[in-house]
Amino acid sequence: MAETYDFLFKFLVIGSAGTGKSCLLHQFIENKFKQDSNHTIGVEFGSRVVNVGGKTVKLQIWDTAGQERFRSVTRSYYRGAAGALLVYDITSRETYNSLAAWLTDARTLASPNIVVILCGNKKDLDPEREVTFLEASRFAQENELMFLETSALTGENVEEAFLKCARTILNKIDSGELDPERMGSGIQYGDASLRQLRQPRSAQAVAPQPCGC
Amino acid sequence: MAPFLSSDAGDMIEMQGFGPSLPAWHLESLCSQGSSCLFCSTRSSPYATPSRCSCVPDRLPLRLLCESMKRQIVARAFYGWLAYCRHLSTVRTHLSALVRHHIIPPARPPGASGGLTKDVWSKYQKDEKNYKELELLRQVYYGGVEHEIRKDVWPFLLGHYKFGMSKKEMEQADSAVAARYKRVLAEWKACEAVVRQREREAQPAPFTKFSSGSSIDSHVQRLVHRDSTISNDVFISVDDLEPPEPPGTEDCRPEPEQELGAGPPGTAVAGRQQSVEFDSPDSGLPSSRNYSVTSGIQSSIDEGQSMGFEEEDGGGEEGSSGLVPAAGAFSEPRDASPHKASRASELEAGAELVAVCTAAYTIELLDTMALNLHRIDKDVQRCDRNYWYFTPPNLERLRDIMCSYVWEHLDVGYVQGMCDLLAPLLVILDNDQLAYSCFSHLMKRMSQNFPNGGAMDTHFANMRSLIQILDSELFELMHQNGDYTHFYFCYRWFLLDFKRELLYEDVFAVWEVIWAARHISSEHFVLFIALALVEAYREIIRDNNMDFTDIIKFFNERAEHHDAQEILQIARELVHKVQMLIENK
């Protein structure tokens, strides 16, 4: 039960409805395609410990609902996310067109420094493609995103997407660009002792005051 | 304790006030407070005491000091108690709205915990006038409905039938709903046909899908196909008004053309759906020949719109008002195009177009419907596909009902989660009209939980108060962990009436109790089920010192593993607890 890891990163999976967010997460966690996936309501959840550049990192991944109507709800989960997979469906231009709005949400609500990787999912459906690789990579470049085309069905590039994002965050920590200590950085140190450090503080608060007056 | 406190209260308040006319012993105690010397003998070093403390302990009568301390302690306790009582009474006033004050017990008359059985139900059906509605509901509340008769009982619980209706009245209710369903189905299917037609023209060949955004053609295509809000920017090409192809040659799946005649006069006109055509990128015409008439059409339509498809219950007015009646709103072409003067010939063609368009829908409506159909299709396909009932034909029925409901509520539109709520109804009732009617009834309550409905925040606030009153230990823990007083971990619970938290068989059992509870114990029974879920795992939550994230994760993982009957039992007990609390105030 007890996991040891050096860091914990909070990740988001965001993007329009039906782009395969839950399937990407499921593929990453379980290494298989989720056949009977239902649309996500509220938020779903997954975590996995990965090894990146000699460090063990626990990814705590929040999988969100896609329909815009739920955006106000989804937003409450954004806070303190270190990384995000921004997902669109390569066979649906509509999902590609709304990327900018999702990105704005992520940068304003999670953190301006959030590390985002753009994922053009459903790569296996190439004959039905509506968005070219070139067009999307241009968008990624303009918005300073990493970019991969993925397939939750075959598993192609799924692991890479998560790992790439994690690696970038680690690099930014190493270079000092990201400060894990800052509130809402979405990064926590993994050792259990640190988590317990938080407890005595609240214990002190309820301890009786020394003076009765 | 209370009487003692209140008799002493005068003194306490005086002490807290520290007015200028203090008696001598008060002054002395004030002195001791001012220098905080009560602890100086124990806290600071003995050498420091005389110099820093003005009141040397041995000069003060020890008894007086103790007295003062005692009073202060009692005062603090009293004020704490008073605040707590005030808080409690506020919460009680608040909570009293959550439950029915009259307690209906399971054991009087006995047997309610056995549930509503087939026997009882057949007795009721033979003698519906003399059976007490409340008695039946009480049995449902305490024991559920026998599976075999759910199909018959649910329409009563949901309000499609009323208890005490005669057979004839029930038939009347059925035929009214059947007629309405048939009409609505015809209405939106006619509209769907136009939407599909429009889509076909917007995407004539697969390769035109690649739009770089640079050419006007693709720009137009994008506007037509994707944009659901800016209807005034949609271009219409007059030159595309060719006679429609016969349906047989179309490559798409056959449209339900035969349905068209079934609708009321307003929809029958949709048989001329093909008249609305849009510029397509491969029309081969220079884009200069496109001109915008949409705004003109729009405004004419708005004027000619007095006749809508009002429902008898007034539920669908917003949604259906977009439909254009076949009135001659366009008998005179309006000066809609800014380029009128220079394009006389086109205006002529425009007049022709307008004449044909009388029978059509507003662009806005078409866009909205297209968007909703798209969303519904996406979700219906993946709705409960691991449950045996949802074979492709049954999914198609689910879609028809869903679209019909959405057509009548286009102002809200389809929201994810609606499918989840409809699916169990269809499974039990296995009848399209009935499921449609019952779903409409169910949504009267449930629609408020959806975004912008406002009920969700109220649920969260109520949960907070309930936990505070019924489980203060857990409340303290939650309070310490800060974040999850927002109770977002209950979001899905409330949105879907626990549908995703439970196995299908348990969903049936829980839902009918929720519906019956409304008349028996609480209109907000869902709150108590939510609370029961929290309580069922309270030790785990407490012992692991779970925070918001842990709790969301925990309950996501526990989904479909709950013991529904146990949860219901706890929930009923919690209602009873609150009822007792209120009674004993």
Swiss-Prot record, chain A:
Keyword rRNA-binding: no
Modification type Phosphoserine: residues: S185, S193
Enzyme category, top tier: hydrolase
Modification sites for 5-glutamyl serotonin: Q67
E.C. numbers: 3.6.5.2
Motif (Switch 2): 65-74
Gene3D superfamilies the record matches: P-loop containing nucleotide triphosphate hydrolases
GO CC, alphabetical: cytosol; early endosome membrane; insulin-responsive compartment; perinuclear region of cytoplasm; plasma membrane; recycling endosome; secretory granule membrane
Subcellular localization, as worded in the UniProt entry: Cell membrane; Early endosome membrane
Position of sequence motif Switch 1: 39-44
Reactions catalysed, as given in the entry: GTP + H2O = GDP + phosphate + H(+)
Residue list for modification N-acetylalanine: A2
Key words, A-Z: Acetylation, Cell membrane, Endosome, GTP-binding, Hydrolase, Lipoprotein, Magnesium, Membrane, Metal-binding, Methylation, Nucleotide-binding, Phosphoprotein, Prenylation, Protein transport, Transport
CDD domains found in the cross-reference section: Rab4
Binding site for Mg(2+): S22, T40, D63
Subunit details: Interacts (GTP-bound form) with RUFY1; the interaction allows endosomal tethering and fusion.
UniProt comment concerning the protein's domains: Switch 1, switch 2 and the interswitch regions are characteristic of Rab GTPases and mediate the interactions with Rab downstream effectors. The switch regions undergo conformational changes upon nucleotide binding which drives interaction with specific sets of effector proteins, with most effectors only binding to GTP-bound Rab.
Family matches, as NCBIfam families: small_GTP (TIGR00231)
Homology family: Belongs to the small GTPase superfamily. Rab family.
UniProt protein name: Ras-related protein Rab-4B
Organism: Homo sapiens (Human)
Classification lineage: Eukaryota, Metazoa, Chordata, Craniata, Vertebrata
